[in-house]
Each structure stands twice: as structure tokens, then as C-alpha cells.
Amino acid sequence: MAGKKEFSVFMHELVPEHRVISEEEKEELLRRYRIRLSQLPQIKASDPAVVELGAKPGDVIEIKRKSPTAGVYLYYRLVVED
């Protein structure tokens, strides 16, 4: 049997760009939108993109999505345990 192929979920054309934001960026995000961390949409720590990023519960992921009408927009999700 040949060696296992490496696969990155980020190489797929339908998967948008993801990144873990810093603590400073997280605080600014919450302040800008006047929300609490618990009010962000959630993403499970077992999500393939989260695993590949090495994010842990409590981190916030910024997702850069493309839109035919809005161009590019940012979406934020809180990493939670399964």
C-alpha cells in the first residue's frame, strides 16, 4: 500500500480562507459589534478546518467569504468543544 496522501481542506475551491484572530482582534471585534463572545456563531473544535488551523476552544476564527454582490465579507465563529 502506498503512503497516505496529504489533503488540505483549504486547497478545495469551495472552502473559504480561515484564520485564527489574535486576542487584541477578538476584543476589538466584540467592542465594535457590542456583543459578548457567547453571541458569536459557533464552530466545533473537530471541524476539519479548525483542526488544520490548530485552533482551540475559545479561539475566534475569521472566515473570508466571497460574494457576487458584496465582493468579500468577513464572518466570525467561536471555536467550541464537541
From Swiss-Prot:
Family matches, as SUPFAM superfamilies: RPB5-like RNA polymerase subunit (SSF55287)
Signal peptide boundaries: none
UniProt main location, coarse: cytoplasm
Catalytic reactions of this protein: RNA(n) + a ribonucleoside 5'-triphosphate = RNA(n+1) + diphosphate
Coiled coil found in the keyword field: no
Pfam families membership: RNA_pol_Rpb5_C
Classification via InterPro entries: Arch_Rpo5/euc_Rpb5, RNA_pol_subH/Rpb5_C, RNA_pol_subH/Rpb5_CS, RPB5-like_sf
PROSITE patterns, per database record: RNA_POL_H_23KD
UniProt KW keywords: Cytoplasm, DNA-directed RNA polymerase, Nucleotidyltransferase, Transcription, Transferase
Gene Ontology BP, a term: tRNA transcription by RNA polymerase III
Record's subcellular location: Cytoplasm
Annotated EC: 2.7.7.6
SUBUNIT field: Part of the RNA polymerase complex.
Function: DNA-dependent RNA polymerase (RNAP) catalyzes the transcription of DNA into RNA using the four ribonucleoside triphosphates as substrates.
Name this polypeptide is given: DNA-directed RNA polymerase subunit Rpo5
Species, as recorded: Thermococcus gammatolerans (strain DSM 15229 / JCM 11827 / EJ3)
UniProt lineage: Archaea, Methanobacteriati, Methanobacteriota, Thermococci, Thermococcales
